[in-house]
């Protein structure tokens, strides 16, 4: 009888350890999910910022090309004079 009680207590202890481990792992999973969500938001924000910068860069290149064209036209007129 004492032997089976000891075995039961060891089993109970192991079950409790398993429950504790599972609980800790669940908490860690939740933390990792939150971190992942934060990182996803940061990536989306960075992508949005990049898209804005690419649009602005494109506009600036167009403006630069326009100014270069005007300058070439002015230089062409000056050479004619």
Curated annotation (Swiss-Prot):
Residues 5-81 form a coiled coil. InterPro entries: Cell_div_ZapB (IPR009252), SNARE (IPR010989). It comes from the Bacteria. Residues 48-59 have a biased composition (Basic and acidic residues). The keyword Iron-sulfur does not apply. GO terms for cellular component: cytoplasm; membrane. The keyword Acetylation does not apply. GO terms for biological process: division septum assembly; FtsZ-dependent cytokinesis; vesicle-mediated transport. It is found in: Cytoplasm. Pfam families: ZapB. Keywords: Cell cycle, Cell division, Coiled coil, Cytoplasm, Septation. Residues 43-65 are annotated as: Disordered. Homodimer. The ends of the coiled-coil dimer bind to each other, forming polymers. Interacts with FtsZ. Belongs to the ZapB family. Non-essential, abundant cell division factor that is required for proper Z-ring formation. It is recruited early to the divisome by direct interaction with FtsZ, stimulating Z-ring assembly and thereby promoting cell division earlier in the cell cycle. Its recruitment to the Z-ring requires functional FtsA or ZipA. This is Cell division protein ZapB. It comes from Klebsiella pneumoniae (strain 342).
């Amino acid at each position: 009888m004492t032997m089976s009680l000891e075995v039961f207590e060891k089993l109970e202890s192991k079950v409790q350890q398993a429950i504790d481990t599972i609980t800790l792992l669940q908490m860690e999973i939740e933390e990792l999910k939150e971190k992942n969500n934060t990182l996803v938001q940061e990536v989306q924000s960075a992508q949005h910022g990049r898209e804005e910068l690419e649009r602005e860069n494109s506009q600036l290149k167009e403006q630069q090309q326009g100014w270069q064209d005007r300058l070439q036209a002015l230089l062409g007129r000056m050479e004619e004079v």
